[in-house]
Amino acid sequence: GGRLLALVADIDPGTGALITAIFCILFTALAGMLSIAYLDVGNGLLMTFAVMLGVAFLVNDAGGLSIAFSELRPDQLSMFGDMGSQAALALFLPTMFLLLGEANMYQKFFSAKDARAAKMAVVGWIAGTLIVETLIDSIGVFGSQVIPGLGTEASEAIVISVAMQALPTVVGIILVCGASAIIVSTANSFLLTPATNLMRDVYQRFINPDVSGTQVLLYTRLMVVALGVIGYVAGNFFPTILAMALWAYT
């Protein structure tokens, strides 16, 4: 979030991170699961529409899909690129196991009204992940031709760079909004899930089984704030922890 605001609004990344943290913490604490679930639907639609629009404009500017492909390097069109099958598998397996064990997704699945809705949610999640991730990667690949010569650090923000430099203003704004939706949705889930687990699975189960529903709601909101502050401090003042988390997640 800090890097996104730094690129878009030209503010200090640290200030951007603080603004993002405050917004996400307050929103998650005040909204709760039901509101976040509905927000995630809107975020998902916005993400999908934004990346589809971005890819469509990049391909159109290149003169069509065949011309866009012809301008890519051979390794960009091969299955494993220049890394080989072993390195590709080393990236695939951790990501796969991460998704299979992502607690915030299971929390949403278990919140479904019935088994059929939960199964449909799983199918939609898998299909949506494949579609959106493929489109995001496509923006990165096609964008590397529009904005060549990016270093390692700059290439990590290529989606935002494409939105600001290569796309029409309206389309770029939509793509930036899609990126913002991804950040907010991820932060909401990563705050609400551990807070709920700590309250339901630890506090209510082992410490105070007779706690009322009103107290659970209040304590969960306070836990969201506490975890958000801890996460912000860990990410900004202990960079090695953030680096390991980013490595594990990406």
Question: Residue locations for each model-derived region?
Answer:
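Membrane-embedded helix-loop-helix hairpins and adjacent transmembrane boundary segments
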Residues: G1-T250
